[in-house]
């Protein structure tokens, strides 16, 4: 089965072709970072317009690279939610227009399910069941993943997502956009232990997270150091303190989730899953505590069409009736992942 995947939930336009026998054939991605940088964040209207401009050229690119024609495609999967409403509508419209023209069925995919399943795109995919740490700019959750469509929330953030805390810390320190990579880069030059920040909910006894207090601690510390006049080394030390605190909490909660479930396999997904410090901490813990940890390829940590094509293919293998040719669609800017059970 050959599935075309289309991702357009926020500020990346991604298209990909995934075959259930041959794997990922091709994927192409356009990031809008440069366009949104001058605004310091994503502007929804600009994001939607750019998805319109990029979708068809990316389609031509992936089909050429995969050596496929429209007649070879069995179904089209697209991100139905959650995300920015206008951006989602662009991807859904493109998917259903192509499907109507080519007489193909479509299937709407949950964006976070795509992230959860993205580590299955590696050469040696993790078997079910596993614990997943889903950590991005909009979400921070620990999930028990029993199979495709069978998800249980073990813990989640009570306020800011981890990626949001990274971005806000970058703004507080006067760093560039996107903030997450900039904070991580600056932290590389920080002195370990020079700044020690609180570890919110580290000992709460549950698997939930909170990052708003950590963000406030960064603000308070930055003001003490001179606010806008803070020197570069002080910025680096503060960035290091922030990253160390965030990573320690994420790693500790992940280990607690493995202990609670009795599972020995952890999957890390989402944009923050590309963070080097987080990967190193979890990999070191895996060696010490004898469990397995899996990551998607760095190129697939960000939003992408490959994960949507994969999720669509896996769902259609299990439940062929989930696709259709009526081409009447809705998008779901807010959508609970656990509602997908089946």
Swiss-Prot record:
InterPro entries: ATPase_NBD (IPR043129), Gcp-like_dom (IPR000905), KAE1/TsaD (IPR017861), TsaD (IPR022450). HAMAP family: TsaD. It is an enzyme of class 2 (transferase). The lineage of its organism: Bacteria, Pseudomonadati, Pseudomonadota, Betaproteobacteria, Burkholderiales. It is found in: Cytoplasm. Keywords: Acyltransferase, Cytoplasm, Iron, Metal-binding, Transferase, tRNA processing. Fe cation binds at residues 111, 115, 303. GO terms for molecular function: iron ion binding; N(6)-L-threonylcarbamoyladenine synthase activity. Its cofactor is Fe(2+). GO terms for cellular component: cytoplasm. This is tRNA N6-adenosine threonylcarbamoyltransferase. The keyword ATP-binding does not apply.
């Amino acid at each position: 089965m050959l599935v075309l995947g289309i991702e357009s939930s926020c500020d990346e336009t991604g298209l990909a072709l995934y075959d259930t026998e041959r794997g990922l054939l091709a994927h192409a991605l356009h990031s809008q970072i440069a366009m949104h940088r001058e605004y310091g964040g994503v502007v929804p209207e600009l994001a939607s317009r750019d998805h319109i401009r990029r979708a068809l050229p990316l389609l031509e690119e992936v089909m050429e690279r995969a050596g496929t024609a429209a007649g070879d495609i069995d179904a089209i999967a697209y991100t139905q939610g959650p995300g920015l409403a206008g951006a989602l509508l662009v991807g859904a419209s493109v998917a259903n227009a192509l499907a109507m023209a080519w007489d193909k069925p479509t299937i709407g995919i949950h964006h976070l399910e795509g992230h959860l399943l993205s580590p299955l795109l590696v050469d040696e995919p993790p078997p079910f069941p596993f614990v997943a740490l889903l950590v991005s700019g909009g979400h921070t959750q620990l999930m028990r993943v029993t199979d495709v469509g069978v998800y249980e929330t073990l813990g989640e953030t009570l306020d800011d997502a981890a990626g949001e805390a990274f971005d806000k810390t970058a703004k507080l320190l006067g760093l560039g956009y996107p903030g997450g990579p900039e904070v991580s880069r600056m932290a590389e030059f920080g002195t370990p232990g020079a700044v020690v920040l609180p570890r919110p909910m580290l000992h709460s006894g549950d698997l939930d997270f909170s990052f708003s207090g950590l963000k406030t601690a960064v603000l308070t510390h930055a003001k003490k150091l001179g606010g806008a006049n803070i020197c570069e080394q002080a910025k680096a030390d503060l960035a290091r303190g922030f990253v160390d605190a965030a990573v320690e909490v994420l790693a500790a909660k992940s280990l607690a989730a493995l202990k609670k479930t009795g599972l020995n396999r952890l999957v890390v997904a989402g944009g923050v899953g590309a963070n080097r410090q987080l990967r190193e901490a979890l990999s070191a813990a895996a060696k010490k505590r004898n469990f397995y940890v899996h990551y998607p390829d760095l190129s697939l940590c960000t939003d992408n069409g490959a994960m949507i094509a994969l999720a669509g293919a896996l769902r259609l293998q299990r439940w062929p009736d989930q696709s259709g040719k009526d081409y009447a669609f809705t998008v779901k800017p807010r959508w609970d992942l656990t509602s997908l059970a089946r």
